[in-house]
């Protein structure tokens, strides 16, 4: 009979050491795993848009210094996201190619589902103040200024082909696998990597795309 009063000695196998380079790669591998999640099942947010005016109207507020995007409505913050900004985040955007994220009051002027960055919500940059400042400094013509003012006041997409630049918006990560992997490895969140846009994880921008309509006010703080 066995003496069960004594612990049975089991053969122990030596643990294999995990190499240091592999340990360093673990955060990046986890990032890639998150980015590869199928976003097609991401549901609409519980705070879905409930009207175009009054207390129910949503507002997007982006704080560049804190790198946070808030969805506000009904007098409170409904959702907060960590964001990535332009490679040159300090200061307001003033010209095409300056890698800066705009600052000021804007609105969602268009939405694009088939974007190379998964989903794209266009922001109405350049806005009125951008156009007026640029005209006073001689950066754009009077016709360009008037065209921007007209479109913005109509609630439409302003010209994106002036010296002030355009195609600034809220989007996800690239749909191209190689580029998405490259950004994930060398610019992990919250490091800034865009040309001036505001970037979220793909499942996050999917939520915004389904719940934030064209016309939603956008405030971008320094």
Model regions and ranges:
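Bacterial N-terminal signal peptides
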Residues: 24-36
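Exported/periplasmic cell-wall-interacting domains
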Residues: 49-52, 110, 114-222
